[in-house]
């Protein structure tokens, strides 16, 4: 699978965010690295079809995406299992094992509002990894995670990248040294 962007442009209020960006994304992790406010989230939103570019072309992005946004977008009154059922329609096989790898318990009946930010972040990642998809868009997926939980998440993200494009927007490239990096410009 290949996703290609050619001459991509996007501005907000007359201020350019992306100016003529071109890249090709294939299976594996590609890190999108840049200071805050320089287009990482914008690029992901364009690829996901949540926004339209001002110019340029996006080819191959009309596939099934799974995403982790900067906000976890969980239903706070539901348990982990309830959140997964709501988002995915049912509990996929392997959900319990995947959550266990992330240090979470699928059978925990507590609503996620009682969980820490890091636990919610890991559940959001699990939801994306369990969703049927051709590509993953991960926007700052390590926010709120300690070193041990970041390592757990990284292992699963690397595995996912063996079969599909994974676009990972981050400020911190620790553990991602072997991934290609698309650096967006400073403002």
What does each model-found stretch correspond to?
Residues 71, 78-90, 94:
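Q-loop/switch helix immediately C-terminal to the Walker
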Residues 98-116:
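Conserved ABC nucleotide-binding domain
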Residues 139, 146:
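ABC-family nucleotide-binding domains
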Residues 3, 17-20:
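Conserved structural motif at the start of ABC-family nucleotide-binding domains
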Residues 48:
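Helix-to-loop junction immediately C-terminal to a conserved catalytic motif
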Residues 111, 140-141:
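Walker B catalytic motif
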Residues 125:
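Hydrophobic anchor residue at the start of the ABC signature
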């Amino acid at each position: 699978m290949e996703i290609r962007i050619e001459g991509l442009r996007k501005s907000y209020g007359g201020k350019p965010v992306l100016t003529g960006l071109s890249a090709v994304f294939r299976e594996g992790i590609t890190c999108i690295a840049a200071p805050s406010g320089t287009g990482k989230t914008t690029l992901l939103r364009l690829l996901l079809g949540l926004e339209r570019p001002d110019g340029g072309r996006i080819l191959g992005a009309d596939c099934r995406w799974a995403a982790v946004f900067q906000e976890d977008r969980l239903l706070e009154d539901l348990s982990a299992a309830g959140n997964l059922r709501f988002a995915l329609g049912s509990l996929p096989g392997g959900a319990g094992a995947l959550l266990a790898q992330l240090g979470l318990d699928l059978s925990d009946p507590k609503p996620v509002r009682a969980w820490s930010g890091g636990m919610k972040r890991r559940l959001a990642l699990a939801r994306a990894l369990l969703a049927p998809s051709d590509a993953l868009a991960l926007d700052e997926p390590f926010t709120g995670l300690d070193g041990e939980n970041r390592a757990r998440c990284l292992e699963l993200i690397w595995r996912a990248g063996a079969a599909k494009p994974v676009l990972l927007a981050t400020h911190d490239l620790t553990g991602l040294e072997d991934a290609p990096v698309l650096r967006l410009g400073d403002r």
